[in-house]
């Protein structure tokens, strides 16, 4: 059987590994290195350069050298405007999507195309090493990548001519590498700080079972951000001294970025780094040189806010896993940025233990991907991987409420459904608005897309039964289906091209959900009372109509008056009146029911009217979907 390789497609560096003789092996590239820079360049002679050779010529060819493209993959242009200004190449909007412009190649590329060139090199190097053509791979993504970013990564593989067997989360892959040979059960926390993304996952590992308990993260925090802090510091110092902003010169910016990365790496092992860039720019007075010293203390001061941002996902993951730091047996560091001493100290302070450094942070994700590739290729047995979805998924229901169908940290693959109904009489279609996030209300969450189910036979509201099914596959990619149980008609959407999460949306959603839990609950209860009152008024009118002359005139007048007052209170959103009138109308309907039974010679009829003013659908427990959605563009 053909070999399946494991690929860590990183922001700054990528790595490929394969199972050989039951053990994972990292494959060196054609240049002899075990990791390959995720850099693509288009040379003046028309050649496409990938990896180390592309990175080496970046200073002389900044406009045609593309790096950190992972930050743009699967995202809309309006979500990456800040990042677009921080690279030496042009980032453009093409119909709202991101494109990068290469004057040298004379064309624009999608981020997927650039990533595909990196993937192709990795697979070609693996093919040479193995002596056979590699066409299948498992590719890793940050745990907090959303549906669009996961699909875009699969598309990059397809462009590269690779059949992507599985997309798996980077921290989960790291846990596979760490726990591959372990028999005893351990609870581990994977702290994955790479070049552009940050993930934290808590897992139970042992005897071949790898179960993710919780995951959290920040898709825009990584080594690039630490480099940017140094670049800004150096540029500001130079501007103060010489009156020139080096960031406006693309070649100078590229040299600064490379010097910043080099200084950052040096400061992991020494307490100060010399930054010497001769002929960085020139004026009419002659050439200018940059010569500065950066201490580790100054570097840590510059990056204090970034290091502090690492704290929130760790605390969130522990909370979601319902664990305390004392319950963690090992902390596994992943990603080159975890070599920063201040990051290691933060981990130690947060979790009260020295992190485990037995794995190579640059290679461990690719090694884990190779193990998963071995499982899918039949080379490895006895491994069970249970991953999770990082954010809750649901739909918008009446009153603008988000009804969660799949809560965050649900094990995938998974399939869950809910039955909803119509909101008005005679409604022949429903608009399904798919949401992602942790807040109570639709407007506070991220819209993933909408679709319409038509052809519902006209019926009183609450009668049609619309089953909405959420299906997440093992790659974490979502499909939503809505089906009218009466007619069997159905409509579906695959959330692949929807606008994706903004820079700080995910952690902001979780944080604000906690901060606003009380006010969210109060607002939700108000909407539920309003919906309940509206439903009760509808039920009362229906009951009076059905009973006709059997209802005494006095009772009928009283109920009609209460219905009128309650409808006015609902229209004005007068919560106090709704709270007062709802039980009064319930009691009036109860009295009507009792009188009817007594006239017929029976006893009282407790529950003759709905006591909770619930929904009017046949199973009584369904929510209703508001028909007045606006289409997401």
From Swiss-Prot:
Compositional bias per record (Low complexity), positions renumbered to this chain: 606-619
Record region (Disordered): 513-534, 598-633
An example molecular function term from Gene Ontology annotations: ATP-dependent protein folding chaperone
This protein's record includes keyword Nucleotide-binding: yes
Induction: By stress conditions e.g. heat shock.
Comp. bias regions, Acidic residues: 620-633
Compositional bias of kind Basic and acidic residues: 513-532
Any Pfam family the entry gives: HSP70
Sites of Phosphothreonine modification: 197
UniProt entry keywords in alphabetical sequence: ATP-binding, Chaperone, Nucleotide-binding, Phosphoprotein, Stress response
Domain of life: Bacteria
InterPro entries: ATPase_NBD, Chaperone_DnaK, Heat_shock_70_CS, HSP70_C_sf, HSP70_peptide-bd_sf, Hsp_70_fam
Listed SUPFAM superfamilies: Actin-like ATPase domain, Heat shock protein 70kD (HSP70), C-terminal subdomain, Heat shock protein 70kD (HSP70), peptide-binding domain
Keyword Chloroplast part of the UniProt annotation: no
Similarity remark: Belongs to the heat shock protein 70 family.
PANTHER family assigned: HEAT SHOCK PROTEIN 70KDA
HAMAP family: DnaK
Free-text function comment from the UniProt entry: Acts as a chaperone.
Protein name per Swiss-Prot or TrEMBL: Chaperone protein dnaK2
Source organism: Nostoc sp. (strain PCC 7120 / SAG 25.82 / UTEX 2576)
């Amino acid at each position: 059987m053909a070999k399946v390789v494991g690929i860590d497609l990183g922001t700054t560096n990528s790595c490929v590994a394969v199972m050989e003789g039951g053990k994972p092996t990292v494959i060196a590239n054609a240049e002899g290195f075990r990791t390959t820079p995720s850099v693509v360049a288009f040379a003046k002679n028309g050649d496409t350069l990938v990896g180390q050779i592309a990175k080496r010529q970046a200073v002389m060819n900044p406009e045609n050298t593309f790096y950190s493209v992972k930050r743009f993959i699967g995202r809309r242009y309006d979500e990456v405007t800040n990042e677009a200004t921080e690279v030496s190449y042009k980032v453009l909007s093409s119909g709202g999507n991101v494109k990068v412009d290469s004057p040298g190649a004379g064309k624009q590329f999608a981020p997927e195309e650039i990533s595909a060139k990196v993937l192709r090199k990795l697979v070609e190097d693996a093919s040479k090493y193995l002596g056979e053509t590699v066409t299948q791979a498992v590719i890793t993504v940050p745990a907090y990548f959303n549906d669009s970013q996961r699909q875009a990564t699969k598309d990059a593989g397809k462009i590269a001519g690779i059949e992507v067997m599985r997309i798996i989360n980077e921290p989960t892959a790291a846990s596979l590498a760490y726990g591959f040979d372990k028999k005893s059960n351990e609870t581990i926390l994977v702290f994955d700080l790479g070049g552009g993304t940050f993930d934290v996952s808590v897992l139970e590992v042992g005897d071949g079972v790898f179960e993710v308990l919780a995951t959290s993260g920040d898709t825009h925090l990584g080594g690039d951000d630490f480099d940017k802090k140094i670049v800004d510091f150096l540029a500001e110092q130079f501007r103060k001294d010489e009156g020139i902003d080096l960031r406006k010169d693309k070649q100078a910016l590229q040299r600064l970025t490379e010097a910043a990365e080099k200084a950052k790496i040096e400061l992991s092992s020494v307490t100060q780094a010399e930054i010497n860039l001769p002929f960085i720019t020139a004026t009419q007075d002659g050439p200018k040189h940059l010569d500065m010293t950066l201490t580790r203390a100054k570097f840590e001061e510059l990056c204090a806010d970034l290091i502090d941002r690492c704290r929130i996902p760790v605390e969130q993951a522990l909370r979601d896993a319902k664990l305390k730091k004392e319950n963690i047996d090992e902390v596994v560091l992943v990603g080159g940025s975890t070599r920063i001493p201040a990051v290691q100290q933060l981990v130690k302070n947060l979790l009260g233990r020295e992190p485990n450094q037995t794995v190579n942070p640059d290679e461990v994700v690719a090694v884990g991907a190779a193990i998963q590739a071995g499982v899918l290729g039949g080379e490895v047995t006895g491994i069970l991987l249970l991953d999770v979805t990082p954010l809750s998924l649901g739909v918008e229901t009446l009153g603008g409420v988000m009804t969660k169908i799949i809560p965050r940290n649900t094990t995938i693959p998974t399939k869950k459904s809910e039955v909803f109904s119509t909101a008005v009489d005679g409604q022949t279609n429903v608009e399904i608005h798919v949401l992602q996030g942790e807040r109570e209300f639709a407007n506070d969450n991220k819209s993933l897309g909408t679709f319409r189910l038509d052809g519902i036979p006209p019926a009183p509201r609450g009668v049609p039964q619309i089953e909405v099914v959420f299906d997440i596959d093992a790659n974490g990619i979502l499909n939503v289906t809505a089906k009218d149980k009466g007619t069997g008609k159905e409509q579906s959407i695959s959330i692949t091209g929807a606008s994706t999460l903004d820079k700080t949306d995910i952690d902001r959603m979780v944080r604000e959900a906690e901060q606003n839990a009380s006010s969210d609950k109060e607002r939700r209860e108000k909407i539920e009372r309003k919906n309940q009152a509206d439903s009760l008024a509808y039920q009362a009118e229906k009951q009076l109509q059905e009973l006709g002359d059997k209802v005494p005139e006095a009772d009928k007048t009283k109920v009609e008056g209460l219905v009128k007052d309650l409808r006015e209170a609902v229209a004005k959103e007068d919560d106090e009146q709704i709270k007062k009138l709802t039980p009064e109308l319930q009691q009036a309907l109860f009295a009507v029911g009792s009188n009817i039974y007594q006239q017929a010679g029976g006893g009282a009829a407790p529950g003759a009217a709905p006591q909770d003013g619930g929904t009017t659908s046949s199973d009584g427990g369904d929510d209703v979907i508001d028909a007045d959605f606006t289409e997401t563009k």
